[in-house]
Amino acid sequence: MAKKSIGQLKLQVPAGAATPSPPIGPALGQRGINIMEFCKAFNAATQEMEKGAPIPVVITYYQDKSFTFSLKTPPVSFFLKKEAQLKSGSKEPGKVSVGSISRDKIRSIAESKMKDLNANDIEAAMRMVEGSARSMGLEVVG
């Protein structure tokens, strides 16, 4: 018989840096999930990824206190800031530009995010990434 799922939890955890300290520990502890077991499994699963990259993770937990988790790709904003070499986006997007990004880089970001985006083709995914870039105050050139 299949295990009965009692909920899901969504977190953004830096790759290879899951620790029992807040915010991870309390979020898992109040749901009865073994914190150290999750931290070890998450860090092992993300050891090949860029250290510190924010990884969205969906944790499904069950009645018998066990859990499974699935990893997503880092947010588009992380890739955009990395490609444009920024620390943060514009305080006033649309008015103040903080930099520019080429369509080639937009395409490479869209290709890497394709499995997590709600898009049918690469062009639609590129438009989504361009929208995120504009919302951060980046100009799309080329």
UniProtKB/Swiss-Prot annotation:
GO terms for cellular component: cytosolic large ribosomal subunit. It comes from the Bacteria. The lineage of its organism: Bacteria, Pseudomonadati, Pseudomonadota, Alphaproteobacteria, Hyphomicrobiales. GO terms for biological process: translation. HAMAP family: Ribosomal_uL11 (MF_00736). CDD domains: Ribosomal_L11. InterPro entries: Ribosomal_uL11, Ribosomal_uL11_bac-typ, Ribosomal_uL11_C, Ribosomal_uL11_C_sf, Ribosomal_uL11_CS, Ribosomal_uL11_N, Ribosomal_uL11_N_sf. Forms part of the ribosomal stalk which helps the ribosome interact with GTP-bound translation factors. Transmembrane segments: none annotated. Pfam families: Ribosomal_L11, Ribosomal_L11_N. Gene3D superfamilies: Ribosomal protein L11, C-terminal domain (1.10.10.250), Ribosomal protein L11/L12, N-terminal domain (3.30.1550.10). The keyword tRNA processing does not apply. Belongs to the universal ribosomal protein uL11 family. Part of the ribosomal stalk of the 50S ribosomal subunit. Interacts with L10 and the large rRNA to form the base of the stalk. L10 forms an elongated spine to which L12 dimers bind in a sequential fashion forming a multimeric L10(L12)X complex. It comes from Bartonella tribocorum (strain CIP 105476 / IBS 506). GO terms for molecular function: large ribosomal subunit rRNA binding; structural constituent of ribosome. This is Large ribosomal subunit protein uL11. Coiled coil: none annotated. The keyword RNA-binding applies. One or more lysine residues are methylated. Keywords: Methylation, Ribonucleoprotein, Ribosomal protein, RNA-binding, rRNA-binding.
